[in-house]
């Protein structure tokens, strides 16, 4: 096996998806704790306390207690290297999450035991479906009262349309929680509350018939457990590796992230069964991870990860070959050579200079506005990875400055923040308005907060008469020019210089489409759809 193939086979790159408040960030922390990446987990609820969750690193996230940008964290576990991409659970940041899901090989879905399958979980699951992403499920907050576990499995199967294969099973819940049974090994892991900040090794009995177990959990509970296990094993699906890898079955685990309980069996199972990096489609051909030449694509851009340095970092998923510090690469969209000096690896916002990276790893590339979401890097081949979209925003606001002298900073701030992809910045052809588009209201708050915090600009966002936006394309230059002249009042350029039609009403958009049949109006733009051939 070549070195590239060997390193690729050790990688496990995944994202955690959930509805807000299902405990995703807490679980992220605990996985890092068990992976030895951090010594003490920062509880996400104790916001006023000094311990902030490692993965919620932007000032605004620390203040509000919600994950707004996806973090990337790497940690070793046993003989594997795990790359964990945390995603925002908040609905307004769905695009960021969507793009993160293009960069992973599998996902972990977190469900709150009391609430079951929630609306955001359904949406994220649809995205995973499009790519047949393998999914494991962690039913969280077992230390609280919740729905009946059999009911929950039924809900996941019915609402999400995926087969469930329970791997661990709870012994009680809430006040009566005693532990979980591992259905594949037969082991019983006892629950011992109150040791939730440091790694704990729970007491393990080899089976439900082990002497001493009845004293620990009570004879009646043990008898009930036997009946329940018989029922569960008769009614549920056994774990099937092929079905899981094809995205048709989800192995299910129960636990309590905040109490570090049930996390270790999940992590052990995950590193053993989750897929290593897979082949990926490009405009030219499929690229296998074990190929010797480096390829990778950018799925996220983050401005100001280090407020002292006003920097922008492009997150690149390595798809094949080996990255080594300072190597020269071919930036496919621009057709230029680019030296990747000082690339970073991440442990949330703790960065280290990457000496090397392998398929499945995510590296950060310093960026001064030359890299866009969806860009592909190779060692010379002109191919582009496909399937990384930009969505048309659904809400629009006009930026209004408190201090007109800070116009330059405002333009720069809006352009840089829009590079991250959660908001989009439009400049109308016929006015000096600066229009920001987003998929949710929270993003305008975030933009205003970050403009003030990171760029020193006080701006407010006010309503503007735009209902929807469409990217405009036409292969006939003359017809496009005519369209521009006739519709100049409704046209704008996005941050990347693409022509966009800003429609005041849906009817207006419909009329424009009918009047210009040669012009293509699209609601999404493939993030790097232009390829320069060197």
Curated annotation (Swiss-Prot):
Protein biosynthesis listed as a keyword: yes
A GO molecular function held by the record: translation release factor activity, codon nonspecific
Keyword tags: Cytoplasm, GTP-binding, Nucleotide-binding, Protein biosynthesis
Record GO biological process: regulation of translational termination
Main location: cytoplasm
List of residues binding GTP: 18-25, 86-90, 140-143
Presence of the UniProt keyword Cytoplasm in the record: yes
GO cellular component, one term: cytosol
Domain tr-type G: 9-278
Entries under NCBIfam families matching the protein: prfC (TIGR00503), PRK00741.1 (NF001964), small_GTP (TIGR00231)
Function: Increases the formation of ribosomal termination complexes and stimulates activities of RF-1 and RF-2. It binds guanine nucleotides and has strong preference for UGA stop codons. It may interact directly with the ribosome. The stimulation of RF-1 and RF-2 is significantly reduced by GTP and GDP, but not by GMP.
Protein name: Peptide chain release factor 3
Species classification: Bacteria, Pseudomonadati, Pseudomonadota, Gammaproteobacteria, Lysobacterales
């Amino acid at each position: 096996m070549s070195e590239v193939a060997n390193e690729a086979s050790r990688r496990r790159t995944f994202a955690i998806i959930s509805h807000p408040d299902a405990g995703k960030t807490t679980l992220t922390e605990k996985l890092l704790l068990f992976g030895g990446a951090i010594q003490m987990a920062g509880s996400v609820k104790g916001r006023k306390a000094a311990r902030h969750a490692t993965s919620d690193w932007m000032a605004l996230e620390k203040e509000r207690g919600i994950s707004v940008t996806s973090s990337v964290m790497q940690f070793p576990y046993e003989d594997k290297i795990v790359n964990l991409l945390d995603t925002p659970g908040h609905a307004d940041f769905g695009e960021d999450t969507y793009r993160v899901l293009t960069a992973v090989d599998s996902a972990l879905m977190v469900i709150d035991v009391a609430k079951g399958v929630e609306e955001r979980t359904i949406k994220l699951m649809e995205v995973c479906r499009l790519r047949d992403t393998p999914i494991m499920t962690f039913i969280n907050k077992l230390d609280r009262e919740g729905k009946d576990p059999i009911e929950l499995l039924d809900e996941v199967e019915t609402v999400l349309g995926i087969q469930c294969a329970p791997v661990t099973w709870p012994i009680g819940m809430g006040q009566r929680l005693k532990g979980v049974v591992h259905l594949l090994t037969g082991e019983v892991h006892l629950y011992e509350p109150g040791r939730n900040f440091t790694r704990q090794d729970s007491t393990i009995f080899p089976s439900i018939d082990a002497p001493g177990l009845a004293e620990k959990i009570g004879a009646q509970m043990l008898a009930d457990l036997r009946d329940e296990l018989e029922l569960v094993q008769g009614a549920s699906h056994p774990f099937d590796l092929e079905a899981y890898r094809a995205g048709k079955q989800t192995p299910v685990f129960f636990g309590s992230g905040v109490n570090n309980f049930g996390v270790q069996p999940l992590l052990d199972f995950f590193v053993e069964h989750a897929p290593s990096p897979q082949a990926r489609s490009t405009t030219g051909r499929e690229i296998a991870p074990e190929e010797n030449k480096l390829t990778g694509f950018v799925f996220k851009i983050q401005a100001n990860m280090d407020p002292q340095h006003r920097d922008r970092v492009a997150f690149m998923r390595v798809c094949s070959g080996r990255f080594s510090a300072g190597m020269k690469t071919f930036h496919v969209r621009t057709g230029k050579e680019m030296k990747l000096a000082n690339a970073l690896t991440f442990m949330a916002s703790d960065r280290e200079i990457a000496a090397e990276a392998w398929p499945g790893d995510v590296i950060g590339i310093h960026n001064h506005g030359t890299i866009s979401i969806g860009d592909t890097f190779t060692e010379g081949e002109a191919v582009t990875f496909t399937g990384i979209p930009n969505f048309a925003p659904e809400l629009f606001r006009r930026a209004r400055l408190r201090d007109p002298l800070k116009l330059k900073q405002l333009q720069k701030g809006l352009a840089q923040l829009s590079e991250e992809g959660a908001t989009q910045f439009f400049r109308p052809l016929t006015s000096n308005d600066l229009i920001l588009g987003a998929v949710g209201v929270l993003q305008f708050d975030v933009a205003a907060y970050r403009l003030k915090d990171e760029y020193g600009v006080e701006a407010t966002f006010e309503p503007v008469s735009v209902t929807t936006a469409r990217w405009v394309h036409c292969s006939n230059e003359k017809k496009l020019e005519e369209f521009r002249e006739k519709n100049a009042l409704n046209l704008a350029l996005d941050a990347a210089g693409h022509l966009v039609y800003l429609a005041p009403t849906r009817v207006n958009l419909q009329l424009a489409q009918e009047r210009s049949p040669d012009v293509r109006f699209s609601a999404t733009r493939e993030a790097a759809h232009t390829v320069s051939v060197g």
